[in-house]
């Protein structure tokens, strides 16, 4: 051939996507198959294709100076055909042939529109025979080293266009809506060939490109990674998943044979030799057809992340050179859920809690199913490691009762979690933005129900791994004084009746089944009583005071109303009725808001007298454990804090 290998490599990367330019021999095979059939004897991808099978590809590449000497200059030709060359091709004026040797398939490497036209023309076609699939896959994988060809492999992996071998005789990019999962199987020899790119580093371009192929149900599709040099290529077989993320242009040729005999067992090696800039896409496959596509950014060093998943439930191999912690992605095999795919209807967005979890409420189960890319650095989900979240959960659940005897901060759903499941039972303080745990679930005295972002209560694992959404406010030390104020937890702190039903919910074995459902401007009352008579007497405290005094029922500002409003006051302040009504124990949490009373509150429509202009705002320094900041901001903020948000 008259062309030098460098020029042919340039032509191959620019027009045919690398390795698509024929192979000088193998007349029985189509041209694009013979390009990857192990023909390393010729000058590489630039050897001329047969003119009979490719009527629109010339024998001499357009960048050849011998051909361009009789025509326009190369710069003018490139300028004319830069963006409009694929529009003027006559393929678009011809009907779509039904044979795989179609001009549309030849042109689909240049234009996404032609790829779409080819995909649409092949909807509903029967699958080709397994023998042709096997031969094509084996020829793709086997000859990738010979035909990848140095510079062509480099440029092809950087620009990442679609190869002709990806669209070949076996309808690679066709959408097969009627195919069954078993009809797409590949033999183990062919699956092993799908792993590596070319020997010169055609990294990641192999028998299937997971971005462009829309496969059947065994191998789930994901978005194309066209920008990265090492776009992953995975060949799937029903028994195991071969997952080999192709390297950067100088990467190695990593292949793992699939383990077909292993039943539902995914292969442990998703080996990735990621380049300095490339993503390493590892795919973890479980026997149930669930793939987790883990996009790891290898921070520092050319070695990517190697993720292994053994879906039997034992710990998978996990090794990487990046600074992120070992992500034991197979701690709970039943919790692994792929990212939401538009082609697969039966997927759940959030992982379901696995059946083997023993933590009450399955917080660890609902969170441990997350693929490792959701976790920040330094957080693992392995229950055997001391710094992991699940280990902290299980240890805290085993140490105390089922209720809130553990710190609320050790819940992974407390601070910054992707699915906010425990969004109810919030503290109604305007400055308190944390989750409480529902002490009524266990029926026990939850003495340590401090706020989740109390610095003393947050677990070390949570602090290291999870940045809390809201910074700690100085008022938060107050909620831990609940333990001193409550007389050993005579009544559970009335947060909400149930974590998901804040307006009172009767649990079957609750020791205090009667709940006050009075809803005022302060929110629901939710105080619990053992008998209906106590509930009735408590309801009278809500309704006993006529006129303006009704506003005072929960806010003990004068000593004359303190005894009558003791139950309602303890209801609105989240503390039990222990101690005298005016004692510091009873007023520990909320009295700085309410002891200001009606006199210093702003009521736009009431005729009640406002305080005298020269009188200072009354601040109860003796009753509360801290100085109230609400008195400093004027009447409107005091109104908002006392009326609306507690």
Swiss-Prot record:
The keyword Ligase does not apply. Pfam families: nlz1. Residues 16-28, 140-152, 189-205, 260-277, 300-315 have a biased composition (Gly residues). A zinc finger (C2H2-type) spans 514-542. GO terms for cellular component: nucleus. Residues 1-11, 217-226 have a biased composition (Polar residues). Signal peptide: none annotated. InterPro entries: Elbow/Noc_ZnFinger, Tscrpt_rep_NocA-like, Znf_C2H2_type. Residues 250-259 have a biased composition (Basic and acidic residues). The modification Omega-N-methylarginine is found at residue 636. Residues 34-52, 130-139, 227-240, 316-330 have a biased composition (Low complexity). GO terms for biological process: G1 to G0 transition involved in cell differentiation; negative regulation of cell population proliferation; negative regulation of DNA-templated transcription; negative regulation of gene expression; neural precursor cell proliferation. The keyword RNA-binding does not apply. GO terms for molecular function: zinc ion binding. Residues 1-70, 121-332 are annotated as: Disordered. The modification N6-acetyllysine is found at residue 209. The modification Phosphoserine is found at residues 102, 231, 237. It comes from the Eukaryota. It is found in: Nucleus. Keywords: Acetylation, Metal-binding, Methylation, Nucleus, Phosphoprotein, Repressor, Transcription, Transcription regulation, Zinc, Zinc-finger. May function as a transcriptional repressor. Belongs to the Elbow/Noc family. This is Zinc finger protein 503. The lineage of its organism: Eukaryota, Metazoa, Chordata, Craniata, Vertebrata. The gene is ZNF503.
């Amino acid at each position: 051939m008259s062309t030098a290998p460098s020029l042919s490599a340039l032509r191959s990367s620019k027009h045919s996507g690398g390795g698509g330019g024929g192979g000088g021999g193998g007349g029985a095979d189509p041209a694009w198959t013979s390009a990857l059939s192990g023909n390393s004897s010729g000058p590489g991808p630039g050897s001329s294709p047969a003119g009979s099978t490719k009527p629109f590809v010339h024998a001499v590449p357009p960048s050849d100076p011998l051909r361009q000497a009789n025509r326009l200059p190369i710069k003018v030709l490139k300028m004319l055909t830069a963006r409009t060359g694929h529009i003027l091709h006559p393929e678009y004026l011809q009907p779509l042939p039904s044979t795989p040797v179609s001009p549309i398939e030849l042109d689909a490497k240049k234009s996404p529109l032609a790829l779409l036209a080819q995909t649409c023309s092949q909807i509903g076609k029967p699958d080709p025979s397994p023998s042709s699939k096997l031969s094509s896959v084996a020829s793709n994988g086997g000859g990738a080293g010979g035909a990848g060809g140095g510079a062509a492999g480099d440029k092809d992996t950087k620009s990442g266009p679609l190869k002709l071998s990806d669209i070949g005789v076996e309808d690679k990019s066709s959408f097969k809506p009627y195919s069954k999962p078993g009809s797409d199987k590949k033999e183990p020899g062919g699956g092993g060939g799908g792993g590596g790119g070319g020997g010169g580093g055609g990294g990641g371009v192999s028998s299937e490109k997971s971005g462009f192929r829309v496969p059947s149900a065994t191998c789930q599709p994901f978005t194309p990674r066209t920008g990265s040099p090492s776009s992953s290529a995975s060949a799937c077989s029903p028994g195991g998943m071969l997952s080999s993320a192709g390297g950067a242009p100088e990467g190695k040729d990593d292949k793992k044979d699939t383990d077909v005999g292993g039943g539902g067992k995914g292969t442990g090696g998703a080996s990735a030799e990621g380049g300095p800039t490339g993503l390493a896409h590892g795919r973890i496959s479980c026997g149930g057809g669930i793939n987790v596509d883990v996009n790891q950014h290898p921070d520092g060093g050319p070695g990517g992340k190697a993720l292994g998943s053994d879906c039997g439930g034992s710990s998978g191999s996990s090794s990487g050179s990046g600074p992120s912690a070992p992500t034991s992605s197979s701690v709970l095999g039943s919790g692994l859920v792929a990212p939401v795919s538009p082609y697969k209807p039966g997927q759940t967005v959030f992982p379901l809690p696995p059946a083997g979890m023993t933590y009450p409420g399955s917080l660890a189960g609902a969170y441990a199913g997350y693929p490792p890319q959701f976790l920040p650095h330094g957080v693992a989900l392995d229950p055997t490691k001391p710094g992991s979240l699940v280990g902290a959960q299980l240890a805290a659940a085993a140490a105390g009762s089922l209720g809130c005897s553990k710190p609320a901060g050790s819940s992974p759903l407390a601070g910054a979690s992707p699915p906010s499941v425990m969004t109810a039972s919030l503290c109604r303080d305007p400055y308190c933005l944390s989750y409480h745990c529902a002490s009524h679930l266990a029926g026990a005295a939850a003495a340590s129900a401090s706020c989740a972002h109390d610095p003393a209560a947050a677990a070390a694992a949570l602090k290291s791994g999870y940045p809390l959404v809201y910074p700690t406010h100085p008022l938060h030390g107050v909620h831990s004084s609940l333990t001193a104020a409550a007389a050993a937890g005579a009544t559970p702190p009335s947060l909400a009746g149930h974590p998901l039903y804040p307006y009172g919910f009767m649990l079957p074995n609750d020791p205090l089944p009667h709940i006050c459902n009075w809803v005022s401007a302060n929110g629901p009352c939710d105080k619990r009583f053992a008998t209906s008579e106590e509930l009735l007497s408590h309801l009278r405290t809500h309704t006993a005071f006529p006129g303006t005094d009704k506003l005072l029922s929960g806010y003990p500002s004068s000593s004359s109303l303190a005894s009558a409003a003791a139950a309602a006051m303890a209801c609105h302040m989240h503390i039990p009725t222990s101690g005298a009504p005016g004692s510091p124990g009873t007023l520990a949490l909320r009295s700085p808001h309410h002891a200001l009373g009606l006199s210093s509150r702003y009521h736009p429509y009431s005729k009640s007298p406002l305080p005298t202009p020269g009188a200072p705002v009354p601040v109860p320094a003796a009753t509360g454990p801290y100085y109230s900041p609400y008195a400093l901001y004027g009447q409107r903020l005091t109104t908002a804090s006392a009326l609306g948000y507690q």
